[in-house]
Structure formats: structure tokens, C-alpha cells
């Protein structure tokens, strides 16, 4: 590619870091780095009522823990109100948007985009050609007022000003794409290339959601359970993508080297915690012995072992290093029995 590749990850800090969003961040990172490009981060916090600092910190901390380093100073939409206002005023001045008096809802006035009512098509890297008749969208709302932009306007302006070349996101955003293309054309922006990823599904093929599946949809849940960050990345990379070989265990560097967006599947990918367990075990085996011993014994509290049992498993003449190796072997045996 002659143009520098720039991808973005734009989470909303309205809840714990969802495992589906982790995969979206990963695929954006892999694609950018595979092409020698930049992976940028922005926080979409226009929902003032639901956005919280603790969720933003959780997202930033999660990305750092996973080793997905961004290449910019993270931006926040809440700090760019003046930028959006400038575009809104220009759209209104050019009669591409207008103030609408509403008869329903809490807002008496909103700003609507003047829909040119045409067919929009784009070539999706995962799904091929996608077409929409935008007449069905009507004149859609893009802001509550010039100081309160809504999602569709803010995301388009941010992508445009950041020079984003590729928008890689979940398939639940496909219906947003025609609106965003219309807005982008109205402000004179160049269209990015789109790739819409298959959803991550539960075992019953329903979409993973906190409401239905609880805390098990969050990154922190797996971090607290002791999974390695590299194992989580490895497993998530295989949800909707494969390298075209039988290889299943990858380091992050190997994923960057092998990642090919053309190998992303269209159908939903089922999250299987047992498979994650296996991937995690394989990554533990790859650790240097010292790291492996520390990892597998860090939560072992000898004081909590009943005295009769302690006398059977402890040897007064055994060094600390030998004891660690014994415990490591015991844990490995238990793990294998559990399989």
C-alpha cells in the first residue's frame, strides 16, 4: 500500500472492557502493524450520563496489559466540541443539515442531516460489495444542537481528521456505514476502507452480552482468573480468523506477521472457554522455567495446607527451588487429569 495505513480503536467508556471489543482492538492493531502503519486510540465519551473514568482506566489498563500499544496521544470526543461545532455550522450554512422542530421526544429542536436519497455501495474487505438505498434512512439526526453532536457525526469527523484509512469493526456497525459515508461525502472527506468482523457468540449462538452472560464477557474476568495476556490475544485472534494452516499457537509478533484480513470469516465465531484453557496451557509451556514456576506457585499458600497433608508433601531438607519444581509438577499433573 502506497498510503500509510492508519487504523483506530474507539471504545466508549460506558462499561467494563468487553471481550468482543478486545478482539476488535487486536484486529486493528494486527492489520496496522502488518502493513507498517499506525494504530490509534480515541475515547468516544459523548454519552455523558454513562461514561465513567473507571471504565476508561479499565480500557487503557487492559490494552497496556495485553501489550497493544497505540501510536498517538489518545483523544476524547468530549474535548472536541468546538471542532464538531465548526463542521455542524458549515453543514447548516451549505444546507446539508438543518435545525428541525420536533413534535415528539424531549428535545424541541435537533439538527438533521439532509439525506440526498441515493444508493450507497462500498467494498467490504470481509463481506464484499455492500449496497444500501439511503432513502430508507430519511433525514437522520446528527446532533441535539451545535454543542452536542451525536455518534454518527463525531465518528466521521474524528476518522477524517485522524487520516484513518481502514475502519475495522463489528458487523453490528454495518447499518451505520451508509449514514457515515453520506456525512463524509458532505464534508468533503475521502472514504476509508471498511471491514466488518463477525460477532463473537456464546455456545447457544447468541451474542455475548453482559446482560445475558454476566462478568464472563469482560477482559478483567479472565485477567483475574489468571489467564496470560498473550494467550487471550492468541485465542481471540482465532475467533473469526485463521492463518490458513494447522498452526494454533502464536506470539503477538507472529500474529502481526501472519495476519491477513482476507482470511477473516463471515459467520459468527463461538467463544469456547475450554479452548481458551488449552491455548493458555500451551503458552504457559512456552514460558522460561523460572517464570513458569513463579506463575504456577504464586497463589500457593503453604500455611493454608492442613498439617497432616503438609507433612506428606513437605521435605525439611528440600530447597525452595526444588519445592517449586515439585509443586509445578503436581499442578501439571492435576491440570492434565482435568482434561
Describe these PLM feature segments.
Residues 2-102, 176-189:
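N-terminal Rossmann-like or analogous alpha/beta NTP/dinucleotide-binding catalytic cores
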Residues 9-13, 43-45, 157, 161, ...:
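Short, histidine-centered active-site or binding-site loop motifs used for metal coordination
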Residues 14, 72, 163-164, 217:
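Short, solvent-exposed beta-strand edge segments and adjacent coil->beta transition regions
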Residues 18, 44, 139, 158-159, ...:
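Acidic active-site catalytic centers that drive phospho-/nucleotidyl reactions
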Residues 28, 59, 91, 113, ...:
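Residue-level signal for inorganic ion chemistry
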Residues 44, 75, 103-104, 196, ...:
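Proline- and acidic/polar-enriched loop/turn elements at helix boundaries
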Residues 53, 67, 172-174, 178, ...:
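Conserved nucleotide- and phosphate/pyrophosphate-binding catalytic cores
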Residues 77, 97-212, 218-219, 243:
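Active-site cores that bind ATP or allylic diphosphates and position pyrophosphate for catalysis
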